[in-house]
C-alpha cells in the first residue's frame, strides 16, 4: 500500500512539473496518456513523463507515435536478435576475439584472468589463478589500468586503477580510494552482484585510454566518455538510427547513465555531423537541458565528437561481421588515438531522451520484415 501511495505522489509531482514546463493542465495530460494506447509502442504514464512526451515543442518526427514504451525496451532487441547469435554482445572475450581478428579497432587487452588451460594471445597475458592476478597487480609498471569482468552489465565489477601502494599492499583507485590486493582479487571468483556479474567468464585488464583532447577539455576528467550508436542491420546494410554521448562526471570512473542515479550526463548526437546537443542528467521531468557542463561550466554549443565519420564506418564494418544480430548497440571510446570499440550490446534502453523515438516508420517496417513475429506478436500491431 505504501508503495502505491509513493507512486501516486510521484505521478502528482510529474504532473505538476509538466504543467509548469508547458502550461498543459492535468486533464490534458491524462487525455494524451490515454491516447498513447493506440500508437503501438505501449507507452504508459512513466514513458509520457520520462521522455517529455508532454512537450510538443520538444518532440521530433511524428512525435509521441514514434516512441517505444519501457515494457518493450528489452522485447525490441529480443525480437530482432536471435538468442543463438548474441554471445559476442555478452561475452567480452568472444567479441574481442572475433572483432580483433577481423581488424576492427577494439580496445586492446593487456591481461586476462581465465581458468582455461590456454587462451588466445589477443587477450594478452594469461592469468590462470588468483595468485597470478595478485602478482600482476603488484607490478607498479602496469598502471594506470582499467579492469572489468568479461560478463557483466552496468559496469558491475569494473575499476579504474591508478597505481599500487606497497606499504599496504593495495591498489589505488582513480577516486583516491584504496582496496587491498586480496579484496580486489576476490571479484575474479566471486560475483559482485549475482544479477549482472558472472565471474566464471573471466576478467580483463586494459591499459587506461586517453580521452580525445577536445572532449577532455569539456569534461576536465580522465574517465572515458563513450558514445552509443544504435544501428539496424539488414540485408541492405547498416542504418544508424540514434546516437548518444555518455559523459562521466567526477569522481565516477565509468560513464553509465543508470537513469541519472550516478550523477553522469547524457547528450544527443547528430547522426550526420556528430554534433552534441540536449544534454541532461536525469529522466524528465526532473531535469533540464544543460547549455554547459554543470560541473566544469564549459559551454556545449558547437561541440562535435571527433572522428565521427570513422565511428560510422566502423558500425558498417561491424554489421557485416555480426549479420544475424539485426540491431546493434555499439559503445565506442573516443580516444586521443581515434575511436576504439568498447563493446557491442544486445539490449539498450536510453535512446529516447532527446525528443526522438525509436519507432519511426522505417523502424516499424524493419521490425515487420526481420523480427520473430511468432515470439513477438506485438510487432504485428505496429
Annotate each PLM feature.
Residues 153, 162-167, 233-237, 271-273, ...:
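Short acidic-glycine loop/turn motifs at beta-strand connectors
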Residues 179-192, 218-313:
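ATP-dependent carboxylate/phosphate-activation module, predominantly the ATP-grasp catalytic core
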Residues 8-142, 151-153, 315:
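Conserved N-proximal alpha/beta basic substrate-recognition cap immediately N-terminal to
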Residues 113, 149-151, 165, 207-210, ...:
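Short, flexible loop/turn elements at secondary-structure junctions
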Residues 142-144, 200-202, 224-228, 240, ...:
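Extracellular structured ligand-interaction cores
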Residues 285-327, 334-382:
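C-terminal active-site "lid" helix and adjoining low-complexity regulatory extension at the edge
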Residues 92-224:
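Active-site nucleotide/adenylate-binding loops and adjacent lid/helix of ATP-dependent enzymes
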Amino acid at each position: 500500500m505504501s508503495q502505491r501511495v509513493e507512486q501516486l505522489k510521484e505521478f502528482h509531482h510529474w504532473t505538476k512539473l509538466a504543467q509548469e514546463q508547458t502550461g498543459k493542465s492535468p486533464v490534458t495530460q491524462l487525455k494524451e496518456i490515454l491516447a498513447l494506447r493506440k500508437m503501438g509502442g505501449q507507452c504508459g504514464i512513466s514513458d509520457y513523463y520520462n521522455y517529455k512526451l508532454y512537450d510538443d515543442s520538444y518532440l521530433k518526427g511524428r512525435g509521441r507515435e514514434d516512441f517505444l514504451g519501457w515494457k518493450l525496451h528489452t522485447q525490441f532487441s529480443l525480437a530482432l536478435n536471435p538468442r543463438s547469435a548474441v554471445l559476442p554482445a555478452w561475452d567480452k572475450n568472444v567479441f574481442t576475439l572475433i572483432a580483433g581478428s577481423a581488424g576492427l579497432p577494439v580496445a586492446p587487452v593487456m591481461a586476462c584472468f581465465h581458468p582455461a588451460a590456454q587462451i588466445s594471445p589477443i587477450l594478452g597475458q594469461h592469468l590462470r589463478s588468483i595468485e597470478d592476478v595478485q602478482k600482476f597487480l603488484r607490478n607498479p609498471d602496469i598502471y594506470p589500468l582499467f579492469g572489468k569482468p568479461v560478463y557483466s552489465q552496468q559496469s558491475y565489477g569494473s575499476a579504474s586503477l591508478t597505481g599500487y601502494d606497497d606499504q599496504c599492499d593495495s591498489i589505488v583507485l582513480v577516486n583516491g580510494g584504496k582496496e587491498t590486493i586480496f579484496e580486489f582479487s576476490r571479484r575474479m571468483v566471486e560475483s559482485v552482484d549475482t544479477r549482472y556479474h558472472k565471474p566464471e567468464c573471466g576478467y580483463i585488464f586494459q591499459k587506461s585510454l586517453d580521452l580525445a583532447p577536445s572532449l577532455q577539455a569539456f569534461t576536465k576528467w580522465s574517465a572515458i566518455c563513450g558514445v552509443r550508436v544504435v544501428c539496424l542491420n539488414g540485408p541492405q546494410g547498416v542504418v544508424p538510427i540514434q546516437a548518444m554521448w555518455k559523459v562521466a562526471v567526477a569522481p565516477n570512473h565509468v560513464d553509465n547513465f543508470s537513469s541519472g542515479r550516478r550523477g553522469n550526463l547524457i547528450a544527443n548526437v547528430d547522426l550526420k555531423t556528430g554534433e552534441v546537443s540536449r544534454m541532461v542528467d536525469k529522466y524528465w521531468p526532473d531535469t533540464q537541458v544543460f547549455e554547459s557542463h554543470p560541473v566544469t561550466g564549459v559551454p556545449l554549443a558547437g561541440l562535435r565528437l571527433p572522428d565521427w565519420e570513422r565511428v560510422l564506418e566502423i558500425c558498417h564494418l561491424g554489421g557485416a561481421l555480426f549479420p544475424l544480430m539485426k540491431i546493434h548497440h555499439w559503445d565506442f571510446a573516443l580516444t586521443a588515438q581515434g575511436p576504439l570499440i568498447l563493446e557491442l550490446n544486445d539490449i539498450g534502453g536510453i535512446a529516447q531522451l532527446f525528443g526522438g523515438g525509436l519507432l519511426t516508420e522505417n523502424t516499424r517496417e524493419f521490425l515487420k520484415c526481420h523480427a520473430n513475429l511468432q515470439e513477438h506478436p506485438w510487432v504485428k500491431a505496429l
